[in-house]
């Protein structure tokens, strides 16, 4: 799995952002780490294309 920076906030949904060769995940406070990892794994192809 691609390493990522996690930013927790009051938002209601998960979001992925690619910026400067980094993967940034924005997640609600209440989201478990396992759910975040599943979300990142499910978008691995998109992340790889974006970082290529």
What is the meaning of each model-derived region?
Residues 1-52:
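Active-site-proximal or metal-binding-adjacent scaffold patches in catalytic folds
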């Amino acid at each position: 799995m691609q390493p990522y920076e996690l930013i927790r906030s009051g938002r209601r949904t998960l979001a992925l952002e690619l910026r400067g060769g980094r993967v940034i995940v924005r997640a609600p406070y209440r989201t478990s780490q396992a759910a975040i990892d599943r979300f990142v794994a499910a978008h691995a192809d998109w992340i790889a294309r974006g970082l290529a």
